[in-house]
């Protein structure tokens, strides 16, 4: 019995060793197949299995890469600036909806605005509070806006900005107050249509201060060359930061109006230029005008930060850099702003064109802004035209087709700019985010913002 038991053990051991040897050989074949060396100089079942395993591994790797990319985009999206503009047109919609305007129904209306933005993945709302030298809040310096009360100078009976700040923060959304610096009117030069307490009207009434407000192209503007104007604009921004818990101050693209080759050296603030040190030092009127805007922008940032360093200050200029830096319009020294910490915290160019635009393709314009912001001293956001989605608009047939039919156009713009590592986006405008015309494009946009 003892001898028989020993034989069984030996037999079992022999089987185990044999199995280990076969397994070792199989692994050698598999390893050789993976290395591209076929010891049998032919295709074996093990080599085929190894090839299939390698293919599966590659597929898994690709899937992992795709998942990682999606996760990276999602992570990037979570930290992005994702804003939408709420303009004076949107106050018109509020007034049209409610014949009797009250604090309660304004709160209800704006709560709907914020919830719509949140549902799309937005985390910030930019509310217009000074569209035309007026105020959609209680101001010491500017009259009540007609866009909230129906008539300039008329008190609506509640403080819209106070309500908007409360509603935004209650819904975990940040809010910026948006001002237009120089614009007083559009399409009218009749001072009598302005409220009696409008500073533009009061300045115009006195000969000594009349040039603080200029008439040009059928509209009225505050004169960028006047120190009193810069002080007024700065005080208006400072009071917002002092009195309201806003997260940012936002300015848009209304700086100098556009001139022609014929009138550029004669019109608007040319008189102030001729009396300036710039003229005496033989510096051009173009340099002079850029300096006036630069002085205001720097002064405004300093004022904002003096009240609350945590409040951001940014500007959304027109999207075409050539227009901004031309001799005939805007006089926005955008390269200086982008590469210095003295002027703004962010720039958000309005890149309102499609990929098919003949001369200002979205990708090309975006790339140019990225290159201009190479120092990374200022955050770069991209403004996107939701208002064009679903509409037959554009400079050529291809672009019109793109905006009208490509429901992924907004999504593609975000994806393109995101791959280029811009810091965020702003979408114009609230009304278009909820319109039927742009609904399909907005639904696609939502997939890359949520």
Predicted regions and their residues:
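Sec-dependent signal peptide cleavage junction
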Residues: 22-39
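Active-site-adjacent "subsite" loops/lids of carbohydrate-active enzymes
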Residues: 76-107, 176-177, 182-243, 400
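The substrate-binding groove and active-site-proximal loops of carbohydrate-active enzymes
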Residues: 89-104, 141-158, 215-231, 281-293, ...
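Aromatic- and glycine-enriched glycan-recognition loops and surfaces
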Residues: 100-120, 146-171, 235, 291-298
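Catalytic domains of carbohydrate-active enzymes, especially glycoside hydrolases
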Residues: 108-135, 243-248, 340-347, 420-424
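Aromatic-lined carbohydrate-binding/catalytic grooves of carbohydrate-active enzymes
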Residues: 120-156
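Polysaccharide-binding and catalytic clefts of secreted carbohydrate-active enzymes
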Residues: 200-320, 325-340, 352-353
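Substrate-binding cleft of secreted/luminal carbohydrate-active enzymes
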Residues: 335, 339-360, 369-372, 376-450
């Amino acid at each position: 019995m003892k001898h028989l038991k020993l034989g069984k053990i030996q037999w079992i051991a022999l089987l185990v060793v044999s199995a280990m040897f076969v397994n070792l050989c199989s692994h050698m074949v598999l390893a050789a197949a993976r290395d591209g060396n076929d010891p049998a100089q032919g295709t074996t079942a093990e080599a085929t299995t190894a090839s299939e395993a390698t293919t599966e591994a590659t597929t898994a790797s690709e899937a992992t890469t795709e998942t990682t990319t999606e996760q990276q985009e999602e992570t990037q999206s979570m930290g992005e600036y994702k804003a939408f503009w709420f303009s004076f047109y949107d106050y018109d919609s509020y007034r049209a909806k409610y014949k009797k305007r009250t604090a309660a129904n304004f709160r209800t209306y704006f709560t709907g605005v914020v919830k719509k933005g949140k549902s799309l993945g937005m985390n910030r709302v930019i509310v217009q509070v000074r569209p035309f030298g007026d105020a959609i809040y209680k101001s010491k310096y500017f009259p009540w806006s007609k866009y909230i009360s129906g008539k300039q100078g008329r008190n609506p009976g509640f403080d819209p900005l106070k309500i908007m700040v409360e509603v935004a923060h209650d819904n975990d959304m940040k809010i910026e107050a948006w001002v237009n610096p120089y614009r007083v009117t559009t399409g009218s030069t009749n001072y009598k249509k302005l409220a009696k307490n409008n500073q533009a009207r009061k300045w115009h009434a006195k000969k000594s201060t009349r040039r603080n407000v200029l008439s040009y192209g059928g509209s009225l503007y505050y004169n960028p060359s006047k120190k009193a104007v810069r002080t007024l604009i700065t005080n208006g921004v400072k009071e917002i930061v002092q009195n309201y818990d806003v997260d940012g101050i936002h300015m848009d693209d209304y700086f100098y109006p556009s001139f022609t080759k014929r009138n550029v050296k004669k019109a608007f603030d040319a008189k102030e230029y001729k009396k300036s040190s710039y003229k005496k030092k033989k510096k051009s009127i173009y340099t002079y005008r850029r300096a006036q805007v630069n002085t205001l922008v720097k002064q405004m940032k300093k004022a904002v930060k003096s009240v609350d360093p945590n409040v951001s200050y940014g500007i959304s200029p027109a999207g075409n850099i050539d227009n901004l830096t031309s001799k005939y319009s805007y006089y926005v020294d955008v390269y200086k702003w982008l590469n210095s910490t003295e002027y703004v915290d962010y720039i958000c160019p309005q890149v309102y064109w499609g990929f098919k635009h003949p001369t200002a393709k979205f990708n090309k314009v975006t790339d140019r802004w990225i290159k201009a912001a190479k120092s990374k001293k200022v955050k770069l956001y991209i403004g996107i035209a939701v208002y064009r989605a679903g509409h037959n608009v554009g400079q050529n047939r291809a672009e019109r087709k793109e905006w009208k039919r490509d429901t992924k156009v907004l999504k593609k713009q975000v994806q393109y700019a995101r791959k280029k590592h811009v810091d965020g986006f702003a979408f114009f405008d609230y009304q278009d985010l909820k319109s039927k015309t742009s609904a399909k494009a907005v639904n696609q946009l939502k997939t890359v913002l949520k």
